[in-house]
Amino acid sequence: MNKLYIGNLSENAAPSDLESIFKDAKIPVSGPFLVKTGYAFVDCPDESWALKAIEALSGKIELHGKPIEVEHSVPKRQRIRKLQIRNIPPHLQWEVLDSLLVQYGVVESCEQVNTDSETAVVNVTYSSKDQARQALDKLNGFQLENFTLKVAYIPDEMAAQQNPLQQPRGRRGLGQRGSSRQGSPGSVSKQKPCDLPLRLLVPTQFVGAIIGKEGATIRNITKQTQSKIDVHRKENAGAAEKSITILSTPEGTSAACKSILEIMHKEAQDIKFTEEIPLKILAHNNFVGRLIGKEGRNLKKIEQDTDTKITISPLQELTLYNPERTITVKGNVETCAKAEEEIMKKIRESYENDIASMNLQAHLIPGLNLNALGLFPPTSGMPPPTSGPPSAMTPPYPQFEQSETETVHLFIPALSVGAIIGKQGQHIKQLSRFAGASIKIAPAEAPDAKVRMVIITGPPEAQFKAQGRIYGKIKEENFVSPKEEVKLEAHIRVPSFAAGRVIGKGGKTVNELQNLSSAEVVVPRDQTPDENDQVVVKITGHFYACQVAQRKIQEILTQVKQHQQQKALQSGPPQSRRK
């Protein structure tokens, strides 16, 4: 994406005019300006320079009295599903952006782009061409917190190479936000092992010492520890701290971290730097609750075992631009290195548990794209579910055949109600918009009630999104112990005449349903039907188990309704003849 389109040019525009504009803006080009009538093309050295040119010049520079337009050059055949959204407010919460994007279709991926500007930039992939076109039309020029969004196509090479019959359906079989297809129909895809990197924050003044003369020091650390180390020194120009990403085995990562700590402490002595140099680890918020532990027990134990003092940045600092929390460890080199081992051990454990949970039962919901639902940290690099070879015809969401509104009563820990509602109701409002569902929390049945009922009303896809986010929030906020799965109870109401079909002869159907979903499914006996002649089915289990059970029960109900309709049609003609 380093080729630029320059539009709104006057007929008198010459290559020398454009050369002068780019030179004044200190933006290099890697080839001549190809000037046509009213527009031109040019290549930048790389994608980051192209983005800088767009942000610095588009709509801000005039040539012969006309403001020039600068965008990525995208051939028509590649203007399909991918958009770049620029000028996003820097402090915007992820969920606000999510809720805005999903208004126009299914978001397969949403990836933040590193940029030097104060505002944020994301690349978004929708599941179809029509959805992307609608998002472009509606969001370009959209006012968001006094910022005007700028939206343009970026090349969609993958979709352009697909069979034309498949393109409009937007079904690519993606298993991960932003990942490419892992194979073709009939092929066997091998899942690449995925490691969780260690991310550090270091004072900018020590970056030179860490890299060393001509990169010698960092190369030496990389070689000795068998690590891949990226020092992000060009990002966030002028920032007091820079991030470092280390990817290796747990042992290699810890060794590299300790080497970097030793270099910083030595450099501090050499330059007579008197301030304390803590170890700062960046971790996605989804893992932090489990690192802290119930009542802070996990963190206290690490502090005691390593003789360090550990603090974590507040939730309020999380923004679209910064989805990570900063874990600050104070101590000497040895104690900080030990603390890093224990902290990352806990974070990796949470990460692996989440992956296992994501993969568990995922094959029972075909084409499930978990990350597009925002149920997993977009920065964590979660691998796709191991559900066999993906198909190009597989949709990115569960294929919900019916769009009828359903009502589910989900019972959550009473202590988690505040987290679900959020400050001044912001979280539950955003969740409702994101899922496209009505979400209400019923009053407590008693002052000392341990659970509260959440009433979720919406079609199947909205149920999936809303329930998934609620499960995730309870896990994230540490309302269950770190090694436990979140298991909630859900109630759905079914017509009393259909309850027998859910149970099956001798309980056969309900037993098969429990074996299939791993959820506990109970149809209480001797229930008195309510005023709508309905009875309750209770489902208890982790998120995927509950979802599979709910969908299977809805399938049974659909079959019962169809059977009734057929009987009514068959009995219709004789009744009319009798009249």
Curated annotation (Swiss-Prot):
Keywords: Cytoplasm, Isopeptide bond, mRNA transport, Nucleus, Phosphoprotein, Repeat, RNA-binding, Translation regulation, Transport, Ubl conjugation. Residues 195-260, 276-343, 405-470, 487-553 form the KH domain. InterPro entries: KH_dom, KH_dom_type_1, KH_dom_type_1_sf, Nucleotide-bd_a/b_plait_sf, RBD_domain_sf, RRM_dom. The modification Phosphothreonine is found at residue 528. Residues 2-75, 81-156 form the RRM domain. GO terms for molecular function: mRNA 3'-UTR binding; mRNA 5'-UTR binding; N6-methyladenosine-containing RNA reader activity; RNA binding; translation regulator activity. Expressed in fetal liver, fetal lung, fetal kidney, fetal thymus, fetal placenta, fetal follicles of ovary and gonocytes of testis, growing oocytes, spermatogonia and semen (at protein level). Expressed in cervix adenocarcinoma, in testicular, pancreatic and renal-cell carcinomas (at protein level). Expressed ubiquitously during fetal development at 8 and 14 weeks of gestation. Expressed in ovary, testis, brain, placenta, pancreatic cancer tissues and pancreatic cancer cell lines. The modification Phosphoserine is found at residue 184. Residues 177-187 have a biased composition (Low complexity). It is found in: Nucleus; Cytoplasm; Cytoplasm, P-body; Cytoplasm, Stress granule. GO terms for biological process: anatomical structure morphogenesis; CRD-mediated mRNA stabilization; mRNA transport; negative regulation of translation; nervous system development; regulation of cytokine production; translation. GO terms for cellular component: cytoplasm; cytoplasmic stress granule; cytosol; nucleus; P-body. There is a cross-link at residues 450, 475 (Glycyl lysine isopeptide (Lys-Gly) (interchain with G-Cter in SUMO2)). Residues 160-192 are annotated as: Disordered. Its main location: nucleus. All KH domains contribute to binding to target mRNA. Domains KH3 and KH4 are the major RNA-binding modules, although KH1 and KH2 also contribute. The KH domains are also required for RNA-dependent homo- and heterooligomerization. The integrity of KH domains seems not to be required for localization to stress granules. RNA-binding factor that may recruit target transcripts to cytoplasmic protein-RNA complexes (mRNPs). This transcript 'caging' into mRNPs allows mRNA transport and transient storage. It also modulates the rate and location at which target transcripts encounter the translational apparatus and shields them from endonuclease attacks or microRNA-mediated degradation. Preferentially binds to N6-methyladenosine (m6A)-containing mRNAs and increases their stability. Binds to the 3'-UTR of CD44 mRNA and stabilizes it, hence promotes cell adhesion and invadopodia formation in cancer cells. Belongs to the RRM IMP/VICKZ family. Autoantibodies against IGF2BP3 are detected in sera from some patients with a variety of carcinomas. Can form homooligomers and heterooligomers with IGF2BP1 and IGF2BP3 in an RNA-dependent manner. Interacts with IGF2BP1. Interacts with ELAVL1, DHX9, HNRNPU, MATR3 and PABPC1. This is Insulin-like growth factor 2 mRNA-binding protein 3. It comes from Homo sapiens.
